Amino acid sequence: MQIFERLGSIQFDPVEPSFGRNAELVLQSRVAGYQPVLLEGLLYQERRLWDGFDKVMCIYPTQDWPNFARRRALMRVHYGGEEHRPMQLAEMVRSELQARGPLSSIDFDHDGRADWFWGETRLVRATLETLFSIGELGIHHRVNTRRIFDLSKNLLPEAVLNALDPFASDEAYQDWHVLRRIGGLGLAQVGSGEHWLGIVGTKSPQRQAALKRLTEAGLVTPVKVTEIPRQTFYARTADLVHLDEMNSCNPTEAAFLAPLDNLLWDRKLIQWIFGFDYIWEVYKPATIRQYGYYVLPVLCGERFVARFEPKFDKKSRRLTVQNWWWEADVTLDQRMQAALARALKDFGTYLNADEIALGAAIENDHSLIGVIGAAKSL
């Protein structure tokens, strides 16, 4: 739970390659010894974590549910009225859930269709998603990509469910959410971008005002980066101690990052500071991809050194380094090889892999042969 307390939330994405969804990939790179059953247990058994909207669809501590009351209220205003077609089935859905327990859209015998955000879908699915967005329903569990819904009152602790909006004003809410988001990012630039999504009622003027209040209160600290003198960044003041800790850390540790890791929420900042341009190409047609379908950035020490396309065969338990693209000017030395070998070994352990191998496209890459060999010897 400590990682959620520090980051606030991690992003959920339903795309599920053989080596795990985004949320699992975030955790495997940040939590030593992480196994997917840990997240599943915290979400759907202990209920200490909750599927809900923050930046977009995210996973966050259940205790934070009251803090998102304004988001749910906004959704109710826009989509919760009787004139909104999916709400025509709301009472039927509530009654069925009350009588039958947790259900997914395929458990309802209703043939109506509706225009929805991404195109036409079943009306009952739109109803479930609307009731979820306004807080009446929660996700009981998932079966692969299918969501099984239940009434929120059956999932949330009573004290959390009945808690009032803790913020007395828009400004108090904005201060909380901006501070939380900075903590999730680690370092934030004030300019508009996807990294500020989901903060209700907060555009550039409100965000600037919140940053000013938080700075005056000593909760955030402006940070200057020598190589980028015209930009001011912000960090949580409580996190600045980690800058000193970095001096005593091993400078050559490596990790394979999730494509939607919090660190990558602001791609512009990553380009400025690390000189690393990353675009997730999962939704691009194969013919126009520069790299691959689901490619993970490779962070080693203080720089991004490569891009990694894994493939995992669940039957044979074989992890294949399907493809690997080194960044320009990267020189593989013994320390980097050892760090990458440890990261690859840890990635295999996360997947319970029995074997690690190179894909056909790179099977003669001597630098990677050395990394694989070192990983196997650990």
Place the predicted regions along the sequence by residue.
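Long, charged, low-complexity, helical-prone intrinsically disordered regions
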Residues: M1-L378
